[in-house]
Amino acid sequence: MVEGVAFGMSGLRLWALLVTVASVGGLVVYFGYGGWLYWRYYVRRRDRAVDWKIQPRRFQPADKHRWGIRVAAVNMLLGGLLSGSFAYYVVGGGYSALYLDAAEHGLAYTLLSVVLLFVAIEASAYYTHRLLHRKWLFKHFHRWHHRCVAPTPFNTVTMHPVEFLMLQVSAFLPIFVLPVHAYVFIGMLVYVLIFNIMDHSGIVMRHLLPWHSTSRFHDDHHVYFHCNFGQNLGWFDRFHGTLRRKDRRYGEKVFGGKGAPVGDERGATPEFVEY
Ligand SMILES: [Zn+2]
Ligand SMILES: [Zn+2]
């Protein structure tokens, strides 16, 4: 194989190497950063939960905690398998809009592409997530992720493997049309994973990057179910009116993303929650 010759190894060995690197890298970020947050707050400051926890009175029972970690580990390995295989496909000359030489599109475009990719991945995640909240998909797949009403850092990818595959594909779709440097894409995947871990941490966090919603934005998604579908940003929820409203009722059975009216709303201005 051409790519095998280029790296001085057989195709199978190259594939195995890429899958191993992607899997180990993913597991190290996930359990390294997630584990550190868990130890720092859930272990060391458990008795002072009111000071740091978004839902200070809610902790997962031990069996659900262990189940969440097992499912997440399987999904991270699945993610490594997919990402490594995708890298092998690209190295072998498979089609994508990724490029390796920054001079090919210029430095200015490469910098702009960071923003474009971020918004494209966010859009992809928002619409996929909204789709997962349709009754059938929610009941059969997305319900797994919503078993964690008070999520911990380990629950970021505690989800049905079918859902994990859907989200993984949705994150990869933009790079088939948007030219992006390969390192920008890899960096973006790590960035999104780290912020996702913070957003599932259950810890009160106000991100230093001003475009990010606070960690309460996604934590509320787990409490109220069908609202706040965005991943890092509240933009798409604001645009579609799916941001949580103080004046509406939400719950597992209230589908549609806009809650249910509590009383007569005639003439009333919607009261959206600030995150
Ligand atoms: Zn959801
Ligand atoms: Zn979640």
Residue ranges and their predicted role:
Residues 178-239:
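Functionally important transmembrane alpha-helices
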Residues 1-127, 131, 140-143, 148-169, ...:
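Non-catalytic, topology-defining segments of multipass membrane proteins
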Residues 106, 137-138, 180-182:
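Short acidic/polar alpha-helix capping motifs at helix-coil junctions
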